[in-house]
Regions:
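Residue-level recognition of tetratricopeptide repeat
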Residues: 32, 36, 70, 104, ...
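Structural motif corresponding to the intra-repeat A-B loop/turn of tetratricopeptide repeats
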Residues: 41, 75, 109, 149-151
Length: 197
């Protein structure tokens, strides 16, 4: 589930690795290897340092920020994780994936009203994208943000009537599994998706 936050933040956002400094990509990749299985704080702190180096080399490198958020969450530093998330805003003001992640991070930090505003904005942006050029990732995350916004588990069948033939069976099953988990333990699932232990 940890990798889902990367999907939420980065899928459908072209951060074009070719345009990112190779040294920044290398530092980010080193941070991922260093973090390993998120088992010890020394490795996580080293991974945060490497993420900071990647960000210093390439301030718009969203994946480095997303990884740093995961490492901070694994250390239980959710306020710092929120501040890191908010640093990405200038690079992603209209990116529904970023706004969804921001909403979850705000909710994790007990800022429910701001989180709800973010969920509403993300839902609107996903709707626009689904009307223009629908993708599996957009629909999957649209269903997810609807649940977070309305605290209601919508039927995939109903949503797929409006947006038919987008989800493959495997992605549909994954989406349904996440939604089933959410309906029982919303806070736990959000915490886990953000990289918290």
């Amino acid at each position: 589930m940890r990798t889902l936050i990367i999907l939420l933040l980065c899928t459908s956002t072209s951060f074009a690795i070719a345009q990112i400094s190779p040294k920044a990509v290398e530092k980010n990749n080193q941070s991922v290897k260093t973090a390993g299985f998120f088992n010890d704080s020394d490795s996580l702190n080293k991974a945060i340092h490497l993420s900071d180096e990647a960000i210093a080399l390439e301030p718009s490198y969203k994946l480095a920020y997303a990884n740093k958020v995961k490492y901070l969450m694994a250390l239980g530093q959710k306020e710092k994780a929120l501040q890191t998330m908010l640093q990405m805003e200038k690079f992603s003001p209209d990116d529904p994936y970023y706004i969804l992640g921001k909403g979850m991070m705000l909710e994790e930090n007990a800022k429910k009203s701001l989180a709800m505003d973010a969920y509403k904005q993300a839902a609107s942006l996903f709707e626009k994208r689904l009307k223009e050029k629908p993708t599996e990732a957009d629909l999957m995350n649209y269903v997810f943000v609807l649940f977070l916004r309305d605290n209601k588990n919508y039927s995939l069948d109903e949503i797929e009537k409006e947006y038919p033939k987008i989800l493959t069976p495997s992605v549909r099953q994954l989406t349904k599994g996440v939604m089933d988990k959410l309906s029982n333990k919303r806070e736990d699932v959000i915490h886990e998706m953000l990289g918290g232990k």
